[in-house]
Amino acid sequence: MTSTQAIFEKVQKVKKTINTATTAEKNLALEEMAKQLLISRADILAANELDMTAAKGKISDVMLDRLYLDEERIAAMAEGIRQLIDLEDPVGQVLERTKLDNGLVISKKRVAMGVIGIIYESRPNVTSDAAALALKSGNAVVLRSGKDAYQTALAIVTALKKGLAQTKISPDCIQLVSDTSRASAQAMMKAKGYLDLLIPRGGAGLIQAVVENATVPVIETGTGIVHVYVDKDADQDKALAIIENAKTSRPSVCNAMEVLLVHEEIAAAFLPRLQKILVTDRDAAREKTVELRLDEKAAQYISGSKARPEDFDTEFLDYVLAVKLVSSLEEAVEHIEAHSTHHSDAIVTENDAAAAYFTEQVDSAAVYVNASTRFTDGGQFGLGCEMGISTQKLHARGPMGLKELSSYKYVIQGTGQVRK
């Protein structure tokens, strides 16, 4: 087992091969990485089967689905890498240029961060997405997978390194930490001087531990306590379609809705229809039904579990939905601001004034009007695959693409000027 410190030192020795690579060199590397991912799919699937077998009975079915790979998902991972080839390289872009009265020309230029560390849980696609995004933005990357997905991550990294071996960029620019204990995570949090940025991707516990303990700069990819508010002026058919998609299309992801707020004026008509699409119809179709956790007012109209206060502060990542009735748009916004993780929140309404109020008052990274929150995704936003969804405000917010993984420096050109 290679020590975490040895990995830090190794990546420091080779980072210049990617930090200074040309766009053409990086794009060639991405193409070779995508090819090797497909060539190695049998090895990746075999490794994934080991992880799946070990995880069964220890994690939920929804989390098992996150871990699971098949040929279609591997093909999607390879396609995600290839999509980055067509995106503009941020490194080297001149953001601003100013000529001062003394003749100095000051340019603000995008540069790579250097070395990015990623701590993540049981998401195999994060391994390929993170490596590809880091490389296209000129960065080396140190990956630390969760224990549940380690064998899969190792097989993926092995394939990606084979791709890099066909190029001028050192394969050692992608590193996978073999130690999945807390000690390696702590080492990455304290790797000042070795990591220029640390990004945690996972549950609330992981993210909180990194934010509270890291001495390395961190971008917080927050959990998703995602709300949909159905206004009294909503198109109810539209609202039901949005809710069904936001809750059931993939409940294990951070942009899935967890809390539904409904204006009490439409509760009598709307809630029975909600129960029909999320419970009755799904049961008849032998699909997983949604457990509705209802506040006291909602329980007067439909059946379900009694909501506890903590249900409105929980990222379920499962077929569970907390439901609350509100008396006004203002109450809905107040609830969201009190309980949201500022990831993604939506309003369904045909009232333009209500929509404008909601988008101005809700302080989240992505605020939707009449659309599913499932669109909060780098690919859906046209950014290619993403490094995560930032819920903080400094440096990056929302889906993090290539530009968010770069910094900038000032280049000052003179003709012999001295300061007087």
UniProtKB/Swiss-Prot annotation:
Keyword vocabulary terms for this entry: Amino-acid biosynthesis, Cytoplasm, NADP, Oxidoreductase, Proline biosynthesis
Keyword check for Transmembrane helix: no
Keyword Amino-acid biosynthesis (UniProt): yes
EC number per UniProt: 1.2.1.41
Enzyme class: oxidoreductase
Function of the protein: Catalyzes the NADPH-dependent reduction of L-glutamate 5-phosphate into L-glutamate 5-semialdehyde and phosphate. The product spontaneously undergoes cyclization to form 1-pyrroline-5-carboxylate.
Name under which the protein is recorded: Gamma-glutamyl phosphate reductase
Protein's cellular compartments: Cytoplasm
